[in-house]
């Protein structure tokens, strides 16, 4: 019985092992790619553990079989064993091909409890594996046999120890046998149920050794053909195969022991001691392997035609072989060490539990595997189907694209023609055909939200394309423009520009966009609650003209407040209630609405509601006390009760106390309306009596675009309405009010503007002369300049301001003003102005105009500002930022310049010389292009102006610039003074008569000389024609005198020589008398009064001039006489000439002394006048005296030169006449006389020239001395005067 039971157990265990093998294979096949690494590690560990267990189990089973054979040997058992060995040899190949997988399954705790004859089946399997050339299996068997079977070489001591351990093992085996019998019965019932369902096939036949795939298929067929009636025979065959395997194992073990190392032999006793635990593990191993084999046969039968699974199995088997080869024999100890602590009972119970679970779930596993295979096939089919559908879709898309392209190419020309015809087709007409381009614009513009963002350039293009104002696209563009303009104006509004913003808003069509206006105002107020009073004032102005807009905004605010109150949104409640409070202050809303809101907030008090009520009271408390004192009194009583109850937070209670204090102060810090925002009169305002319950609909439809069929008519109506409201201002913005009008509308609006511009403004128009925009511009420029680090950054910021045309000059004025305000000149401003002139030429002309205006108004600038301004313009000039032609406004003379302008010119040219250098500046000023512009700076029209210019530039240290002027002044023709009319009227007089009558007529000549001097001053600027006429008249008079003299000389030659000597003596006496008289007159003049000083000086000058003339004429005559008598009396001549020279020198010294005394006297007189008049008229007197002093030497020089020229002319004419007369009288016989005359003429000429040169030299020396003395005195006077001025300024 025990044998049959063991055979049944082995069969069931083999079936169960086949099932488990199939499960593990299916799982590993489906998850092959994922769990390759895991299966390798687990299979290695499990093989190590199971090898040790199998060796112990084989030893136990061999002992049991020997006992059973000795008890019940029979023929039937032998036959059954033979059959079983044959069948097992065939089936072992299939089961052993999956040995690696069975080992992994057994390691997870799925170990069967069947014991008995599983070791025999393992031996048979090992033989078949050896035949089928499976090296991994052979290595496992060799390891087992080496561990279990003791070789001949082992010592007797070790054998005796093994014999002592056998009875202990037998006791354990008896208990195991009992437990296995129970489990075997259960496995037999399960196996019978499974075998009934299997098909009966032919009995198994031995097959030749082939590849693993073929062996496994045949084994599956043979295992499926088994029947329950032959199980006993199989068990007998298995027992026989066990015996054979044991013998062969002994021989192999001995053989391997011979080959093995001595270390293994030493370890064998320790292994034999641990055999019981190994036997248990080997039993579980055999059972699990049989179960895996059965399951794998079923799975292979279902998926026999799948080639992919075969390839996977081949790769798996090869990997398992490689792993088994790589294992070392020494690793079998590790699982033993791990499981030393486990008791045999515990391990048995665990194996039983796993076996029960496995047996119950075998059917479920089979079903699951079948479902899994079906699902895999289903997925494959679905994948194929999806790929096919995708390919079809792509083909259809390609075909559609080709069709669309062909359609487009065919109909492009047709669409182009239809565009022109249907361009103005409106969207309202459903029958109208519109183009693709128009459809796109309509799609973008007619959506509710406005569609995507359209850039301004594209929007203008779209607007230009749409020519029909009644179309939806055009109205949509106008709507978007209206929305942007309203939103922009609302964001710009403040206390200062509220009037301007209101006018601009009224120019827009706010009746059409009233929803947009109310929404933007509410949004702006919520974003900036501090400007609530400004928005309320704006609403009040609009409400006075359009009450429906004010009512709509008030409705929306009340609805917003109610919603926020229901939602407990404190921030929205605060903002909306604050706006309503200011609307109550502006009389847009009635006070009943405010009282209703307060009662709503206070009747059910919470911390938030009371806080909102207090904020509301602060804003409109003053107005409510004026309008309804009882109502606000009731509100404050309710607040007092809330405060006494003390249920609220301490913070809120403190706020209530603060409100009572504010009320006590009369809301002085919370005024209802400030003065600058009281823009609407009380009679013009429209107050809305709106209650909390009345506000129901916010009319949000007005916020969205709506097509208007009468768009043009409504726009014209609103234009007329805005003109009535605004007056003439509305006509200025007709073109921009629509903000979406095309070129036709703009041209018509401009025509209207022109017609209305001709009309005179009405009396009610307001003209803003405060120049607020100009002030704001100057403020921004000033702040930008002061906030910049360098001039480049400042220029960049100012260029980004985008100034309007005409504002460039304001920018230039700001540059100059900022520069003038500095304590010292900063180059920053010059560089900034230069940069603007270089960037844009439009700034050059404003700077040139500012230069001219500044030069004309230099007297208004103080010294510091004058210095900075002149240096600023010097920088612009030397950098050529502005033209040098601006210097034509400067006229450098005494009359056209002031002290401020001279200082301006001085600093300007000194700065230019510092920047450019004197040579470069001189070169620039000599440029022919600038000659006309610099004519005022370097005047050549009048010597007086020329000298002033030379003296000015010399005084400022730039005399090198006046070299050309100095040269011009030297080479210029000197003006000849006009000759007195009395002198011209007189007849020519003899020399003797003129000399005798000179003393008697001294007074008359002095007066005539003074008159001639005055006339010469007045006629200094006369024309050249007058001077030429005067000179011609003088030459005629000289000719007449010369003729008379020639006649007299002829007569005198015939007269006696005695008369000549008498005349000469009489002349000398007369000259001495004249000199004495002159001395007396000069002494008298020094003691005379101040009024007669001028006349006496002029008379002395005239006398000196006349005396010099008479002396020169007398000297000439005396020289002639002495020369004629030189042969006879040479000593007299030399004495006379010496005496005359001494007398002349004395006369000159006397004149200088007298002049010096006159000058001193005049200076004293001027100082006295200056002290009397307070220094006012001193400049004028000095100027006049200086003029006279300058003109006196000029007159002298001119007169002396004129007289010399006249003398030379007379001598020449006389000599010519004399030579002619002599030639006529004597003819050719008077050659000797002619030679004598020529020699005499030459000697006379030499004498004359010598005398003239000596006189000239003496005169020049005297003149230079007097001039240097005058200059020194002048400097001393100026220095003393400057001291007086400085001291007076310092004293105040």
UniProtKB/Swiss-Prot annotation:
Record GO terms (molecular function): RNA binding
PROSITE patterns recorded: MI
Keyword Transcription regulation: no
Compositional bias (Basic residues): 264-291, 312-357, 1040-1083, 1118-1135
Biased composition (Basic and acidic residues): 22-37, 58-79, 154-182, 246-258, 292-311, 358-380, 388-423, 1145-1218, 1230-1292
One Pfam family this sequence matches: MA3
InterPro entries in UniProt: ARM-type_fold (IPR016024), CWC22_splicing_factor (IPR050781), Initiation_fac_eIF4g_MI (IPR003891), MIF4G-like_typ-3 (IPR003890)
Keywords, comma-separated and alphabetical: mRNA processing, mRNA splicing, Nucleus
Gene3D superfamilies membership: 1.25.40.180
Span list, region Disordered: 1-425, 726-767, 989-1292
Name of the featured protein: Pre-mRNA-splicing factor CWC22 homolog
Organism field: Musca domestica (House fly)
Described function: Required for pre-mRNA splicing and for exon-junction complex (EJC) assembly. Hinders eIF4AIII from non-specifically binding RNA and escorts it to the splicing machinery to promote EJC assembly on mature mRNAs.
Domain MIF4G: 483-666
